[in-house]
UniProtKB/Swiss-Prot annotation:
It comes from Emericella nidulans (strain FGSC A4 / ATCC 38163 / CBS 112.46 / NRRL 194 / M139) (Aspergillus nidulans). SUPFAM superfamilies: Metallo-dependent hydrolases. Its cofactor is Zn(2+). It is an enzyme of class 3 (hydrolase). The gene is aah1. Zn(2+) binds at residues 25, 27, 221, 301. It is found in: Cytoplasm; Nucleus. Its EC number is 3.5.4.2. This is Adenine deaminase. It catalyses: adenine + H2O + H(+) = hypoxanthine + NH4(+). Keywords: Cytoplasm, Hydrolase, Metal-binding, Nucleotide metabolism, Nucleus, Zinc. Pfam families: A_deaminase. Belongs to the metallo-dependent hydrolases superfamily. Adenosine and AMP deaminases family. Adenine deaminase type 2 subfamily. One of its GO terms (molecular function) is zinc ion binding. It comes from the Eukaryota.
Amino acid sequence: MCPPNTPYQSQWHAFLHSLPKCEHHVHLEGCLEPPLIFSMARKNNVSLPSPSSNPAYTSVETLSKRYGHFSSLDDFLSFYFIGMTVLKTQSDFAELAWTYFKRAHAEGVHHTEVFFDPQVHMERGLEYRVIVDGYVDGCKRAEKELGISTRLIMCFLKHLPLESAQRLYDTALNEGDLGLDGRNPVIHGLGASSSEVGPPKDLFRPIYLGAKEKSINLTAHAGEEGDASYIAAALDMGATRIDHGIRLGEDPELMERVAREEVLLTVCPVSNLQLKCVKSVAEVPIRKFLDAGVRFSINSDDPAYFGAYILECYCAVQEAFNLSVADWRLIAENGVKGSWIGEERKNELLWRIDECVKRFEGVL
């Protein structure tokens, strides 16, 4: 369906493209396409793995081909962390963010909340301000030139010690970038990602409980490779949003809680397929979530690595589930309602969704 092969698919493609979207689960470092990795490596004199040690890095083409064959989450992460080493300057981070925002805007994204991973960059010697200010530059440009609204979510990495996350959290607070009482609150939430199975489920509990007291928005990756208990642990330490969450259906009682508390799941179907969490997009519990009243949005996760930006993810879901226009309206509206934006912006986006649906209701 991306691209469409029949007139009927063309109509659906036009609708899904036009439908105003909110993206809540995309890692900016996961938007490093192979051409950008190689060009930034040359510019910044960064040595990528030699072709003899890792043939994937022989060329842009070989790296692109390797991206289609990840065996697991950790296999993907090994490439993900190598890729981000090419980022060195504030302008690099701004360029990366802008590259994503342009693509997202072209595919109908009106609001996006993006993850970034400062810990790894800081561990290799980059200054905190270089990272944050670069991404903020990209966000401001997107808002000014594209008219989309943006939010930055600072992600803690589960494979690193709690102390590393605590230092980052303290730095963000001291710099005034985080929290309602921050001098310049450019970071709008906290997240937790990287390897799921292995680290303690509640690794960041001390940080999250403190952040909750400051009314800082909290989310966490859970229920991707780990079972539903990882989702419960994230909720119990203060998360009000769950990233992935596809294992939720294994626990009916927990699913009732998630629906009742209007927790938003940021589902990434193509990512789940690429990382072997499911055998097909049809195994992602989209229909089950709709029937149970569980709110979710559909997202691209790390689109440069998984070969699918948000429109392709929407198309993949439509191909797998044959949803109705009413289903898509609900998904889009729940994405707005679960966003970390003010009521005025939410109402504006809900109006845009309504106008889009009106144009297509009699066609599909």
